[in-house]
Swiss-Prot record:
One of the record's GO molecular function terms: uracil phosphoribosyltransferase activity
Superkingdom of the organism of origin: Bacteria
Single Gene Ontology BP annotation: uracil salvage
Name of this chain's protein: Uracil phosphoribosyltransferase
Catalytic class of the enzyme: transferase
Residues binding 5-phospho-alpha-D-ribose 1-diphosphate, per UniProt: 78, 103, 130-138, 201
Length: 211
């Protein structure tokens, strides 16, 4: 497993505004989209490509194209949906699947409640979208789910991570072909397993609280 924290002034600026509790949901959504596009630029550096011959208005030349099948983007519901637009703007030809996983706030167990993915993921490059890597439980279970379907190349794009969650992932996935791309590794988890300083509940800040 590899971890990359994207060090860029635009990333730091947008993340600072996201952290601010006074940032309204519409602005939060827009900044999340913009930040994910910046992270995705780094996350896709190793995307699989092949040479392709094209003809410009002047002459024939050899360029670069994605290999087939194209990358598969998998947002983890519901907060991961807020990251999807930023990713597909950069990679519009990617296919999109969905994985519904949630943490029980009392037991901290991970519950899988929905999935829409190909049965066979062999040979697919997969990009998982999940804004907060807190305990690491959700992402760990998502990666295991994808590996069971045949995946062997998974990149996870997150806004923030806690050191505790990263350590747990490293323990269980140290030899796996997994890359974690982040805007920041924060200080710690609090007693409720929230990232500190963090930015609060990403899903609630993206979409509000329904119910």
């Amino acid at each position: 497993m590899r971890t990359l924290v994207v060090d860029h002034p635009l990333v730091a600026h947008k993340l600072t505004v996201l952290r601010d509790k006074n940032t309204p949901s519409p602005v939060f959504r827009q900044l999340t989209e913009e930040l994910v596009t910046l992270l995705a630029y780094e996350a896709t550096r190793e995307v699989k490509t092949q040479p392709v011959e094209i003809e410009t208005p002047v002459t024939k030349t050899v360029g670069t194209a994605f290999t087939k099948p194209t990358p598969l983007v998998v947002p983890i519901l519901r907060a991961g949906l807020g990251m999807l637009e930023g990713m597909t703007k950069l990679v519009p030809t990617a296919e999109v699947g969905f994985l519904g996983m949630a943490r029980d706030e009392e037991t901290l167990d991970i519950i899988t409640y929905a999935e829409r993915l190909p049965e066979d993921l062999t040979g697919r490059q997969i990009f998982v979208l999940d804004p907060m890597l807190a305990t690491g439980g959700t992402l760990r279970e998502a990666i295991k789910f994808l590996f069971k379907r045949g995946a062997s190349d998974v990149t996870c794009i997150c806004l923030l991570a806690a050191p505790e969650g990263l350590s747990k992932l490293e323990e269980e996935l140290s030899d796996a072909n997994v890359k974690i791309v982040l805007a920041s590794i924060d200080e710690k988890l609090n007693e409720k397993s929230y990232i500190v300083p963090g930015l609060g509940d990403a899903g609630d800040r993206l979409y509000g609280v329904a119910g």
